[in-house]
């Protein structure tokens, strides 16, 4: 199990400085295995995106642990955690996170700025753009891309450093059926290639691509 969360929970104060809290994620355990695609479905506000950001090492939990290859993420200093996250986790964030001033290829290459490797990343970036069907748009700007193309670009960016873990937050939101299927197929292919892939979505179509499915409701995670 390459990523494991135990006793993980998150509370938020209802008002600044207030004593009343809202439990976004109730204590839960979950693990991700290499070569498998896991899906968490649930309506907006169910806590699934909060859970994903904790698993990604971005949002500090109220309680519990997140371990990546045995290393407790939140026992690390911020710089150490960021370095581990950039090296081992590919994140497909919710919405359009492209930098409009950069080309599609340069957007895909952004992770290499944060975490360098010996081999030149440009060749890998172009290879991924071919894989996701965007080779002809490498020098285009994100404003020239459709919603489906932007999501495919985000997946290529997440896979650039060949991370063993891929976390995708609502990767098919706002896409038509054909584009949603294309995006989910790419994530399925990443799992087939050996990555541990997690998809959180308010849509149920992703379950058809999953090895394991969960639902989330009011911060509670339930195995399907």
Q: Can you say where each PLM-predicted feature lies in the sequence?
A:
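ABC-type ATPase nucleotide-binding domains, specifically the catalytic core motifs of the NBD
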Residues: 13-17, 109-122, 131-132
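ABC ATPase NBD coupling module
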Residues: 19, 73-90, 192
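Helix-to-loop junction immediately C-terminal to a conserved catalytic motif
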Residues: 56
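Conserved ABC transporter NBD signature motif
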Residues: 64-72
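Conserved ABC ATPase signature
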Residues: 141-145, 149
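A short, proline-enriched helix->beta-strand linker immediately N-terminal to the Walker B motif
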Residues: 160-164
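Catalytic Walker B motif of ABC-type/P-loop ATPase nucleotide-binding domains
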Residues: 166-169
């Amino acid at each position: 199990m390459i990523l494991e969360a135990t006793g993980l929970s998150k509370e938020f104060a209802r008002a600044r400085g207030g004593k009343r809290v809202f439990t976004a994620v109730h204590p839960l355990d979950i693990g991700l295995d290499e070569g498998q695609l896991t899906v968490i479905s649930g309506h907006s506000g169910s806590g699934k995106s909060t859970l994903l950001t904790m698993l990604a090492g971005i949002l500090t939990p109220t309680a519990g642990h997140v371990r990546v290859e045995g290393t407790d993420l939140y026992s690390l200093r911020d710089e150490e955690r960021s370095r581990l996250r950039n090296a081992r986790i590919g994140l497909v964030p919710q919405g359009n996170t492209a930098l409009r001033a950069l080309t599609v290829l340069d957007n895909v290459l952004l992770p290499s700025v944060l975490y360098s490797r010996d081999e030149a990343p440009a060749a890998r970036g172009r290879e991924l753009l071919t894989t996701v069907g965007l080779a002809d748009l490498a020098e285009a700007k994100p404003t020239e891309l459709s919603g489906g193309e932007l999501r495919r670009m985000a997946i290529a960016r997440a896979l650039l450093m060949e991370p063993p873990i891929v976390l995708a937050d609502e990767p098919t939101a706002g896409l038509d059926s054909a584009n949603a299927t294309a995006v989910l197929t790419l994530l399925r292919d990443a799992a087939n290639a050996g990555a541990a892939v997690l998809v959180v979505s308010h849509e149920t179509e992703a379950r058809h691509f999953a090895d394991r499915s969960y639902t989330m409701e009011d911060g509670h995670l339930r195995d399907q």
